Swiss-Prot record:
Part of the 30S ribosomal subunit. NCBIfam families: PRK05610.1, uS17_bact. Signal peptide: none annotated. Keywords: Ribonucleoprotein, Ribosomal protein, RNA-binding, rRNA-binding. One of its GO terms (biological process) is translation. This is Small ribosomal subunit protein uS17. InterPro entries: NA-bd_OB-fold (IPR012340), Ribosomal_uS17 (IPR000266), Ribosomal_uS17_bact/chlr (IPR019984), Ribosomal_uS17_CS (IPR019979). Pfam families: Ribosomal_S17. Gene3D superfamilies: Nucleic acid-binding proteins. One of the primary rRNA binding proteins, it binds specifically to the 5'-end of 16S ribosomal RNA. It comes from the Bacteria.
Length: 99
């Protein structure tokens, strides 16, 4: 049986080798018939700490890696603009607003 794959947005990268990915889906309300947006969070393993907040990533099902982690980051689909700016600041050695 093939492993499940999901695409979502990284909402937290504060942990070592772990990211929290929010995956949104549309679910039809049984009585009203209106589509409702549902969001679920998944803890995913990020081996090289490459993911940053706001990145769009693809995750794949895996064996249990810890109490909460059952997913691995397969690839980064799209980098966030915010993540690129903070990475540039870190490389420069701080904020450029210092007077």
């Amino acid at each position: 049986m093939p492993k499940k794959k999901l695409i979502g947005e990284v909402v937290s990268d504060k942990m070592d080798k772990t990211v929290v990915v929010a995956v949104s889906t549309l679910v039809k309300h049984p009585r009203v018939g209106k589509y409702i947006k549902r969001t679920k969070k998944y803890y995913a393993h990020d081996e090289n700490n490459e993911c940053r907040d706001g990145d769009i990533v693809e995750i794949i099902e895996s064996r249990p890696l810890s109490k909460l982690k059952r997913w691995r980051v397969l690839r980064i689909v799209e980098r966030s603009v915010f993540a690129d700016e903070t990475l540039d600041e870190e490389l420069e050695g701080g904020s450029s607003d210092d007077n």
